[in-house]
UniProtKB/Swiss-Prot annotation:
Pathway of action: Cofactor biosynthesis; (R)-pantothenate biosynthesis; (R)-pantoate from 3-methyl-2-oxobutanoate: step 1/2
Annotated protein name in UniProt: 3-methyl-2-oxobutanoate hydroxymethyltransferase
Subunit structure: Homodecamer; pentamer of dimers.
GO BP field: pantothenate biosynthetic process
Location(s) in or outside the cell: Cytoplasm
Record gene name: panB
Annotated GO MF terms: 3-methyl-2-oxobutanoate hydroxymethyltransferase activity; magnesium ion binding
Taxonomic lineage of the native organism: Bacteria, Pseudomonadati, Pseudomonadota, Betaproteobacteria, Burkholderiales
Amino acid sequence: MSYLQESNRKAVTVTSLQAMRAAGERIVMLTAYDSSFAALMDRNGTDVLLVGDSLGNVMQGQKTTLPVTLEHIVYHTECVSRGTTKALLVSDLPFGTYGTPEQAFHSAVRVMQAGAQMVKLEGGVWLAPTIKFLVERSIPVCAHIGLTPQSVHAFGGFKVQGRGDEAAAQLKADALAVQDAGAQLVVMEAIPAGLAGEVTRLLAIPTIGIGAGLECSGQVLVMHDMLGVFPGHRPKFVRNFMDGQTTIDGAVAAYVAAVKDGTFPGPEHTFA
């Protein structure tokens, strides 16, 4: 089945994501960092484009996302917004830019003015007051729980989260807290597939998985990972969609179709 953008395809909005969840239609998200790739992903039916602080890894060659600044995100958001017509544009708030609700608001205003339609922040229960502060000021929020890369040093490395009863209970508490604070989307990274399914059923808002199994409302991958460009370690949850394709358009279309059809992620891409 083709999911190529048609002229009558409506622009994706925060409210239409909720409608997709209610209808059982899986949400497709990819990272994007420039206008050309944004346009390519958009015309192939990607629902959400994420200007991720992963640009530190794949664009700048950094070992972590921590060196990424707000100015970097603003610049890449401006670039991506120029190539986007239908997809919803979400931008990360980078490390150190949302330590207080007031700081988060000023950071979010910068990226919204650059073209973002939603901001993504990493954190759970502790972040709820900040999310509430932003939502009350008309800033849509996507929360990111589980493995949060900005906390890599606190975690002692990039490790699967939510294993064990206590950790699973904490992740559920995080999910409910960000939802209750007003988040309209939740990314869950590197958690057991069964737990991700429980959280997805527990919430009334869409969940987006990356290394979180098939039961999430949608999936996200870093563009470079999806295209088989691995500058370092290849995560377990990554599939190279360039395999069997001759063009990047073909690879993106294959990714969109695999997410929509529920053939990605497979068991080999998930954690127990």
